């Protein structure tokens, strides 16, 4: 990787700088560039065929030291000392363990102190660093862009290519600037920013782009908040999301297990501090959000772009002028069993899920505990609080958060993807409605027939207490 990210004569965006520093072979105008990959993250769902391909070709993993695996999607979040009940899930986890042992890849298995969701584990260990290229066979790899890394999800054939070569053929992406300036009102969070953005530009608004999030409201976010924003870039159709590193980034990384130390830290800092979009650099697209105008946000439909402020009502498809939008809304409302004009705050839930690679970090759990402290989960509501990693769980326990959750009547679980997706035992029953801090509200995402409303941790906690979609201010 070069050290001249800020010294070129032509103004460049942050994404262009990281890209240029990783071009092994330029493809010119007609072919993809060959891009070097600094960190490859692996889990049990998208890797089995990739390892099989290596085995059939007689190839090793080229850089096992730059590869990390963890078990997250299929693992249960209770009784983790017992065999996994579902045979498909059990096979995938056992296959990952065999593959990692055979190919010399680091693995954090279920029960390990460092196990957790891959996009929580990488940053907390200091493996994710500014200026890196990061890939994983998982859509939400964009999370790591919060550190100024170029991070993206890839398919299984690409996973095999990276395992074998530590490179990936890619064509340059378009660039989009999302400018969020102003001060966020009290109770408005990073999750509300990204849900509002997706509602504004649509689930295809960022297609083919790398989004750079900029502006005073973004700069004021913690690293956890920045990861939440970048995590859902894919829900806006983008290939990746990035935020330029700054003092908040450096303080988060300092003294992490795999962060540079001593003179290496000083050298890294000199490079990292150049990772900013140059004055005069041109983005293909620019979008603006006024932070002061934002409020707690919630989805009503079956894609992340179908969202409104919590203070609003379920929209009426008949008032939509675009035919495709109207038809999608009608279909979504039928699945969600909602009526136009219903105030969002009147919608009752059966379950609340706190967790996922979007909102399963310690800051998220602190927010939830602050709301739940001294209160009880509403009768008839099931609440799952699932830490994004065992390290997050240990920290939450040390801070007494686990006791707050259980005292309120919530289920305090072990680490994993859990109810974000129907690949493990934590699922909704058909017809159940859930307020979830995760990232996708597709039909059946949390279990066949389940209905999902995407919310922030603060809204999730307040909803659990009131039993209807609510913000903490509604509890006063």
From Swiss-Prot:
Question: Per the UniProt entry, what species is this protein from, by scientific name?
Answer: Mycobacterium avium (strain 104)
> What gene does the UniProt entry assign to this protein?
leuC
Q: What is this protein called?
A: 3-isopropylmalate dehydratase large subunit
The cofactor remark states: Binds 1 [4Fe-4S] cluster per subunit.
Q: Where are the transmembrane segments?
A: none
Single biological process term from Gene Ontology: L-leucine biosynthetic process
Keyword terms, alphabetized: 4Fe-4S, Amino-acid biosynthesis, Branched-chain amino acid biosynthesis, Iron, Iron-sulfur, Leucine biosynthesis, Lyase, Metal-binding
Q: Which InterPro entries match?
A: 3-IsopropMal_deHydase_lsu, Acnase/IPM_dHydase_lsu_aba_1/3, Acoase/IPM_deHydtase_lsu_aba, Aconitase_4Fe-4S_BS, Aconitase_4Fe-4S_dom, IPM_dehydratase_rel_enz, IPMI_cat
Extract the Gene3D superfamilies matched here: Aconitase, domain 3
Q: Which cysteines are joined by disulfide bonds?
A: none
């Amino acid at each position: 990787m070069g050290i001249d990210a800020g010294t070129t004569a032509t103004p460049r965006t942050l994404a262009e700088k990281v890209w240029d520093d990783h071009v092994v072979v330029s493809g010119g105008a007609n072919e993809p560039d060959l891009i070097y990959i600094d960190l490859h993250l692996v889990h049990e769902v998208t890797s089995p065929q990739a390892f099989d391909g290596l085995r059939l070709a007689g190839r090793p993993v080229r850089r096992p030291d730059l590869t990390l695996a963890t078990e997250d999607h299929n693992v249960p979040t209770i009784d983790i000392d017992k065999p996994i009940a579902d045979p498909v899930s059990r096979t995938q986890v056992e296959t990952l363990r065999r593959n990692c042992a055979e190919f010399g890849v680091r693995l954090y298995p279920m029960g390990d102190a460092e196990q957790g969701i891959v996009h929580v584990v990488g940053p907390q260990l200091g493996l994710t660093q500014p200026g890196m290229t990061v890939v994983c066979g998982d859509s939400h790899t964009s999370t790591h862009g919060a550190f100024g890394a170029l991070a993206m999800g890839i398919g299984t054939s690409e996973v095999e290519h990276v395992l074998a070569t530590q490179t990936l053929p890619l064509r340059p992406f378009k660039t989009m600037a999302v400018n969020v300036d102003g001060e966020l009102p009290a109770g408005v969070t990073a999750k509300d920013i990204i849900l509002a953005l997706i509602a504004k530009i649509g689930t295809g608004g960022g297609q083919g782009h790398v989004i750079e999030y900029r502006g005073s409201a973004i700069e004021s976010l913690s690293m956890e908040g920045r990861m939440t924003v970048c995590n859902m870039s894919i829900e806006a159709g983008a290939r990746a999301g990035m935020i330029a590193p700054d003092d908040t980034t450096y303080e988060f990384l300092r003294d992490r297990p795999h962060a540079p130390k001593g003179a290496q830290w000083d050298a890294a800092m000199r490079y990292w501090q150049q990772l900013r979009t140059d004055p005069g650099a041109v983005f293909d697209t620019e979008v603006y959000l006024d932070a002061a105008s934002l409020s707690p946000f919630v989805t009503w439909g079956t894609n992340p772009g179908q969202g409104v402020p919590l203070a609003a009502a379920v929209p009426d498809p008949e008032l939509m002028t675009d035919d495709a939008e109207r038809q999608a809304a009608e279909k979504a409302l039928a699945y969600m069993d909602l009526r136009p004009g219903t105030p969002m705050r009147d919608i009752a839930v059966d379950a609340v899920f706190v967790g996922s690679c979007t909102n399963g970090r310690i800051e998220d759990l602190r927010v939830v505990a602050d709301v739940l402290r001294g209160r009880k989960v509403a009768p008839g509501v099931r609440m799952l609080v699932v830490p994004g990693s065992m390290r997050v769980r240990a920290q939450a326990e040390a801070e007494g958060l686990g006791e707050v959750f259980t005292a309120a009547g919530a289920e305090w679980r072990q680490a994993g993807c859990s109810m974000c997706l129907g690949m493990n035992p934590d699922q909704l029953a058909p017809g159940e409605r859930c307020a979830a801090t995760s990232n996708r509200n597709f039909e059946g995402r949390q279990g066949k027939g389940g209905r999902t409303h995407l919310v922030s941790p603060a809204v999730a906690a307040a909803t659990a207490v009131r039993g209807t979609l609510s913000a903490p201010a509604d509890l006063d």
